[in-house]
Amino acid sequence: MARSPCCEKNGLKKGPWTSEEDQKLVDYIQKHGYGNWRTLPKNAGLQRCGKSCRLRWTNYLRPDIKRGRFSFEEEETIIQLHSFLGNKWSAIAARLPGRTDNEIKNFWNTHIRKKLLRMGIDPVTHSPRLDLLDISSILASSLYNSSSHHMNMSRLMMDTNRRHHQQHPLVNPEILKLATSLFSQNQNQNLVVDHDSRTQEKQTVYSQTGVNQYQTNQYFENTITQELQSSMPPFPNEARQFNNMDHHFNGFGEQNLVSTSTTSVQDCYNPSFNDYSSSNFVLDPSYSDQSFNFANSVLNTPSSSPSPTTLNSSYINSSSCSTEDEIESYCSNLMKFDIPDFLDVNGFII
């Protein structure tokens, strides 16, 4: 006896499911379970066939469905299971919790199959096929630029010859030679690029090291200069005190010298000064003393003052005998004097 169709064509709804239909199906399965999919639509009050209800529940409405992109581990599992099971998507979905058979089939046809073809692998037998290998995409792909994913062409040819013992080879040997040369050339270019990048990195490191060393030297020089300036004794203050004292003594000597020289020169050139004669002043032995006492010898009054007659005669004689040379010698002798020992300034010099 032949099996009757799952649903009658008259009065059944086809097309997308509405939210009301989804809610009715979920409520019925949560209360009674799905049971027999042939009788479920009639019991749940749905104008759908049993197959449509099963697919709607399995692929969209069941609570344990895993949404989102497939992970790398799930992709590897699908490839391995497909190499053993083939296109048995329900069996593959049973080993991937949370994934549906329809979702796995769509992911295989849209992503995994195309990826295997680009890698030169037959998606049916999972064996290498160089006639399916897209060399341009491999050379442009960053996956094969890394050293860990370079394809070994000689190993690939050995595996092909071992697995397929046929009279006619699968691939033309000229294509194999071309592929091998392209891979080797690409590898050499990668080595040159890596060498250039490493050289540039070393030059950058050397330049940065030189700049850092120069900045460090400048920092240490500034630090040493500041420490020396902070540790120096207050020499400027002592020098200022010494300059004040030196100025004081110089002012003292200049004042006495100016007053004395002025008085002496006036005494020399004044013909009518009292109590002193120019001859006595010039010939006074006290001027041989090289000290500051010459002012006292000039200003002190002699013990015995001569008479006016003697003064006049001595003044006339001195006037007749003195010349310009004597005046110059007198002035030069007047400027010659030594600083006494008690004014020794060596003690002030540090």
Curated annotation (Swiss-Prot):
Induction of synthesis: Induced by light. Induced by wounding, salt stress and abscisic acid. Induced by the lepidopteran herbivore Pieris rapae (white cabbage butterfly) feeding.
Inactivation phenotype: No visible phenotype under normal growth conditions, but mutant plant show increased susceptibility to the herbivore Pieris rapae (white cabbage butterfly) feeding.
An example of a GO molecular function for this protein is:
DNA-binding transcription factor activity
Kindly give the Gene3D superfamilies that the UniProt entry links to this protein. Answer: Homeodomain-like
A GO CC term? nucleus
Output the SMART domains linked to this UniProt entry: SANT (SM00717)
The record's tissue-specificity note reads: Expressed in rosette leaves, cauline leaves and flowers.
Q: Which PROSITE patterns match?
A: HTH_MYB
Q: Where is the HTH myb-type domain?
A: 9-65, 66-116
Q: Which GO terms describe its biological process?
A: defense response; regulation of DNA-templated transcription; response to osmotic stress; response to wounding
| Major location (coarse) | nucleus
**In its keyword annotation, does this UniProt entry include Transcription?**
yes
User: Could you tell me which residues form the DNA-binding region?
Assistant: 37-61, 89-112
The record's subcellular locations are: Nucleus
InterPro entries annotated for this entry? Answer: Homeodomain-like_sf (IPR009057), Myb_dom (IPR017930), Myb_TF_plants (IPR015495), SANT/Myb (IPR001005)
State one Pfam family annotation. Myb_DNA-binding
Keywords noted in UniProt: DNA-binding, Nucleus, Plant defense, Repeat, Stress response, Transcription, Transcription regulation
Function comment: Probable transcription factor that may function in osmotic stress and wounding signaling pathways. Contributes to basal resistance against the herbivore Pieris rapae (white cabbage butterfly) feeding.
Name the UniProt record assigns to this protein: Transcription factor MYB102
Q: Which organism is it from?
A: Arabidopsis thaliana (Mouse-ear cress)
**Lineage, broadest ranks:** Eukaryota, Viridiplantae, Streptophyta, Embryophyta, Tracheophyta
